A protein has these predicted regions:
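Subset of outer-membrane beta-barrel
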Residues: 2-127
Length: 127
């Protein structure tokens, strides 16, 4: 996608949104760290993001690593709520969470040809 984005992402967050944006960072930008927390659906779901990006020894190349977590926490477990006689025992109520993790490795490169830079990048995601 190169620079074909509505809102340009050329920082550590580019690993998820547009990996080619990592190539816009210069070696002088050094190591970048980023973190984000967002609550979805009125606080029911939690979205967390942690990443870092660093330049390689070759100019114009950049690596990025990201961890994404989406979870729904404190889900009531009502399987043991009822006793054998049919009465309700709230002491048997417990909670659990449902969580998905994704790990991303990103690589970006910038090539300067003729009229301006050409940036490309890609990510490998493991869920």
């Amino acid at each position: 996608m190169g620079n074909a984005v509505i809102a340009s992402t050329n920082d550590v967050y580019a690993g998820v949104w547009n990996p080619a944006g990592l190539a816009a960072l210069t070696p002088d930008d050094g190591l970048q760290l980023g973190a984000m927390h967002s609550e979805w659906f009125g606080g029911v779901g939690n979205y967390d993001y942690l990443s870092f990006s660093l330049p390689t020894t070759q100019g114009g190349n950049r690596l990025g690593f990201s961890l994404v977590r989406f979870g729904i926490d404190q889900i009531p477990n009502t399987l043991s709520l009822y006793e054998s006689d049919g009465s309700i025992n709230f002491d048997n109520l417990s909670e659990f969470s449902s969580v998905d993790y994704a790990f991303l490795g990103s690589y970006a490169k910038e090539i300067n040809k003729g009229k301006g830079p050409i940036r490309f990048g890609g990510s490998v995601k493991v869920v």
